[in-house]
Amino acid sequence: KLKKEINNLSKATHREITKSRQHFLILHLPSTYRDIMNMGITDDYTMGYAMEIGFRASTSRSFLFYDLEMEYTTALRVHPFAVMEGTLRDYQQMNVEQALIAYKNIIDEVKAVNGTYISLWHTESVSDKNRWVGWRELYEKMIDYALS
């Protein structure tokens, strides 16, 4: 099924699909990574927490996935993310102002180690509708802060 979805997306976009993020951040290691590598995926952006801020792999830098069962370094590059907007709003019950402080804190931590800052945002959260009013502006402020 996933291979078919990758092929359909590739046809629709006229691009080779090489990047992935698993829905709900569900990873079954090592099988998820083995499966997506077999389908031509070279980069994955699933490595992060749903309910917490921080790095699930203890690093802010991308790395090649090491398959412990097979005892070898694969060609799959894992890109850990620092925080998901839903973590702050839904799990940690932060408002926009509190979330901006949290984003700035993690950005500062990543900058201090010369790491790569990646955050996960969903299209709904930048719509500025319903429960996400104010989060689009927060997104823009977060980007500005990360780039400063």
Task: Give, region by region, the residue ranges found by the protein language model.
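Glycine-rich phosphate-binding "P-loop"
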Residues: 1
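Active-site-adjacent pocket scaffolds in enzyme catalytic domains
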Residues: 7-110
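C-terminal domain-boundary segment and adjacent tail
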Residues: 10-12, 97-148
